[in-house]
């Protein structure tokens, strides 16, 4: 087996919008980094209450 690829761990998933691997929001299968999520959360229907 040459060039085996890890399919587990924190670095496997990435942001759908920018490709960043840190600060990923995976809840509800969103898969956006926190920066992209803050930019488009309102368009997705999320509201800020406080």
UniProtKB/Swiss-Prot annotation:
Name used for this protein in its record: Small ribosomal subunit protein uS14
Keywords attached to this entry: Metal-binding, Ribonucleoprotein, Ribosomal protein, RNA-binding, rRNA-binding, Zinc
Keyword RNA-binding on entry: yes
Residues holding Zn(2+): 15, 18, 33, 36
Membership in a protein family: Belongs to the universal ribosomal protein uS14 family. Zinc-binding uS14 subfamily.
Domain of life of the organism encoding this protein: Archaea
Cofactor (UniProt): Zn(2+)
Keyword Metal-binding: yes
Subunit structure: Part of the 30S ribosomal subunit.
GO biological process, one term: cytoplasmic translation
GO CC annotation: cytosolic small ribosomal subunit
Organism, scientific name: Methanosarcina mazei (strain ATCC BAA-159 / DSM 3647 / Goe1 / Go1 / JCM 11833 / OCM 88)
Cofactor note (record): Binds 1 zinc ion per subunit.
Pfam families: Ribosomal_S14
Function: Binds 16S rRNA, required for the assembly of 30S particles.
Gene from which this protein is expressed: rps14
Gene Ontology MF terms in the entry: rRNA binding; structural constituent of ribosome; zinc ion binding
